[in-house]
DNA sequence: GTTAGCACTCCTCGGCCAAGAGTGCTAAAG
DNA sequence: CTTTAGCACTCTTGGCCGAGGAGTGCTAAC
């Protein structure tokens, strides 16, 4: 991967990629001659060499050069200026997260919005998910004669709600007592452990009422669903802005992007991969085996608290993407979100029990 | 609006519109001659009359006819067959809602998905919102030494969560006691009433601790925000499928739709209008004053429990939309959702107090 | 009132050509 | 051996033209 390239050849490659990212037009030898202080013929020779090396290509004889996947890859790994976001931008982002730090379920909206604006492409964010969710607390609230609202709080802070049928005339006091008992029974338990509590009735003293069993089973089911992330949704933002990029001149491109985002590729393939990796993942075009990604690049990072709970944040854009800026943005925002989550319950890791 | 049109002329108009909806191609006199049992010349005469009446138009001399806004309007109000969904479809939809009836926050996802598939256009759904939200219940859950999770349940069943800073070493028992006191203080109260509780400290006996005031203020703020629907989001689905329609041949169309959905037109203009109206609203093309809607039609219906809590469900598509099917779908799904919400807490309306 | 016939209009699409962009090669210069 | 000027060559792009075709509007006959 790390090819032998002399200094000037690297400069040419870098210049081609930067200009192509900037203008979306194949770059001609003439364009670089001036800034490199050599003639266009010399640049052409260098370009031809880079093309032999598989880093550049061109669309037809009389067209300028543009990078291949390998070219972009080399750029990202060896050539690119790793510019961080300006401190001003960092402050703004921090500030916005600070504003809503208490509203957990707005995080993903904010993260997607900020990332889309900062990286100037479409952003994707998944909500944080526990590897193994642990029970924290339930609450039972009477809604009317026959219905009860079950609010389930999981350890990493996510809240699930559900309604359950109840015996008529169950009072709120009774419900609170029941909730209290279940909270003790299920304290810190995993989904499996809770399912067992409902099934191995005999060990419970006094035995559980049928309503209590129903509640416990509902809790177990909700936690299992949560772990299998049946409900996991990808939130995205910035699609509209991305459509102004020239690569989206025809509607099929738009359809491709939408079907990557909403049609499963993201969820089935990219997100799991990002969850399983450390650091920022950069996937350029056809490097990924999924054919529908051929013309797109994806930059993803896990965020969260190590080994405890994690989500994914990142961007999706055309292969011709502002890699330096996008990578910095993804890295920075993943960091901010991880810090915030650390504040919320990272400490618990250090002080083992509550 | 209700023009004088003889029977045959109505038949011609209806046939033109149905065929145009079907094929997206201007319809020629020849196309209708067979099915109407007259010659193409006769059809042409009728078409010319309909054009004079402002119900049809054509793009250039040698092109077939297509409906104007007024033509579609006449069709929707006087000509269209009001076919209900098949009982099989109805059962399927009912069944799907039944499956997730307990998971309130999945309703809008399901509704949008089902509607998009049934009506075969893009669907939009807003979550149910109370006209004036009333306090139901809070719960305070210790997350770690310095942070507390506040879970707020509103009367119509929605749940808000928020984290608050707390004195170190506050125990869960203390928090539960505080929650209990606040639950009593705020019982069934409105946002304003709760804000007053926090401000008119003097009336409280014993006086509220600073943490209690913080909690109450947070509750009041959350409820106010909820009423002003600062956070109200429109969920949509089916965009990808709609892009296969021939009107989306160029990307500007896609941008237009996205900016209607996400750029404010929906939220600022259409949703409030639908919330304020009874029944199914049909807005055809330029009938609405917003220029960006010129080429689109919108069908919206309020759903919910009358005077208590309501949301909006509907579809957005090209003007050439399958009105009969879309209108039936929107009406039916709004009905199903209203029924479900009625089950949840509509009864309360009949039995005045809890 | 209906319809056959026909002239007329306007769009669509393919082919063609000129202009332009940019390369690759060659041969000369450094 | 590297660099560069020069030039022929290739391929795209955009405009233009003209044939073909679709569908109308009108007129005159039924």
UniProtKB/Swiss-Prot annotation, chains A, B:
A Pfam family recorded for this sequence: HrcA
Domain of life of the organism encoding this protein: Bacteria
Keywords: Repressor, Stress response, Transcription, Transcription regulation
One of the protein's GO biological processes: negative regulation of DNA-templated transcription
Keyword Transcription: yes
Entry annotated with the keyword Chaperone: no
GO MF annotations, alphabetized: DNA binding
Summary of the function given for this chain in its UniProt record: Negative regulator of class I heat shock genes (grpE-dnaK-dnaJ and groELS operons). Prevents heat-shock induction of these operons.
Similarity comment: family membership: Belongs to the HrcA family.
Descriptive protein name: Heat-inducible transcription repressor HrcA
Organism: Herpetosiphon aurantiacus (strain ATCC 23779 / DSM 785 / 114-95)
